[in-house]
Amino acid sequence: MKLLFDLFPVILFFIAFKLYGIYVATAVAIIASIAQVAYVYAKNKRIEKMHIITLALIVILGGATLILQDETFIKWKPTVVNWGFALVFLGSHFIGQKPIIRRMMDQAISLPDTAWIKLSYMWIAFFIFSGIANIYVAYQYDTDTWVNFKLFGLMGLTLAFILIQGVYISRFIKSSDLDKNDETEEKVMDSTIETLAEVELDSVVDSKHDSKKS
């Protein structure tokens, strides 16, 4: 149920796209994302910083999708998003007391300092690689191939990365702590998946728009 709620904007996006087209669907996704964050705030009286950042990305980049008609911008946008996240994660090593990934997951699991640093750099490498992969496919292959890569390739990379991350983290979790932390870990991973889902939503918006132009 939590994952379904996290994917609420994505589901509405696809429904609106089938019925009314890309621009109405993009507007619906923006409105749905704002409503989603507003609901979380009304329920919990607080919003995580990552939720605010991802909402801002959807509003700004989704708004750009509605206004701009430049195919080059559309194809570069997912790369800019991924590299932007890489910069945020890298910057968190120098601003604040903890890397941002540690702030997200510190209450759920206990890891050595070196493990948190390695985990953070795994995320940074993932975002950089995703950005490079997007540009490579966009410029080396036709638009149809790029759209397929955006819809299926990067989603597959994302799922594989989450699995690798889970295996890495599991090396440091004591079996005696599993039952106590199960619920919290599930909440943290749901939040992480939500963030990735929102980034993938922006990628889907780009892909569908470019496909329509073709």
Curated annotation (Swiss-Prot):
It is found in: Cell inner membrane. GO terms for cellular component: plasma membrane. The keyword Cell inner membrane applies. The chain crosses the membrane at residues 11-31, 50-70, 81-101, 119-139, 149-169. It is a multi-pass membrane protein. Pfam families: IspA. It comes from the Bacteria. Keywords: Cell inner membrane, Cell membrane, Membrane, Transmembrane, Transmembrane helix. Belongs to the YciB family. Plays a role in cell envelope biogenesis, maintenance of cell envelope integrity and membrane homeostasis. This is Inner membrane-spanning protein YciB.
